[in-house]
Amino acid sequence: MNSPMSPVGELFSMIRIISFLIILSFPILGYTPGKWSHKDAYLFKKVKKVPNKEIVRNGEGQVVYVAEYEYNSDGKLITETYSDKEGKGDGKTTFRYTDGLLSSEEVYDNGGHLVERKDFQFKGRALKKMNVKDGEGRLLIVYSIESDGEGNVFAAEGKNLETKDNESFRFQIDPKHPNVQIQYLTDDKKKGLGEIHFKFDTKGNLVEREFFQGENRRVHKLKYKADGSLESHSFHVKQGDNWILEKTHVLVYE
């Protein structure tokens, strides 16, 4: 489950760490401009060890919501079911596949009503386009995507059909820190909307992503088990000179 956000996801989180011209060596999956989730790997490829549950706690350690995951026989994620801090149902997201490729993602509220639908189009095994529709089927956003056959997104541009706004991104390796890559987010006039710095360890695992937007700064930290599986990830916001813990996600494996 991504954060801080609703189950639908926020626009400016993360995406595949690749520039337009240089293919980098660290595989991060993602299909929406500016969005990343550890679950993307469960949609595009078969992962040996996948979690069956994710527990989210606030800065005080209280459980705020839980996500439970269901997979098909190929190991692909097919259902993500949410419950609130009291254990009551809070909607779900379902995923469908055609010939092993992700074809749609549907978000439902607690009453079972469709809130949002995403349709995916591929060329071969490379994701090329994604259409976002509301619960009534109205087309809201069209994403043009450059990706490879592994689900890794290189570049993308989103066009909002209602506001007529466009948003895109580009990547650049930090020349002083080769294990750090910078994502620049821009609008249709190439005005900077912010940037995100990604830090990797020597094994190629993403361990930190830091967000810069004006005076605002946030950090997302990821922790791994000895076998390389994601153990937990946490979100922090800077207030003055201090970093404040917002929430922590703990993954549960059977």
Cite the ranges covered by each PLM segment.
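Intrinsic disorder/low-complexity segments
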Residues: E10-S13, I28
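Intrinsically disordered, low-complexity segments enriched in serine/proline and basic residues
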Residues: S3-S6, E10-L11
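Hydrophobic h-region of N-terminal signal peptides that target proteins for export
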Residues: I22-Y31
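Sec-dependent signal peptide recognition
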Residues: S13-L21
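Buried hydrophobic residues that stabilize the cores of well-folded domains
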Residues: Y31-E254
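Short intrinsically disordered, low-complexity coil segments enriched in acidic
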Residues: M1-S3, F26
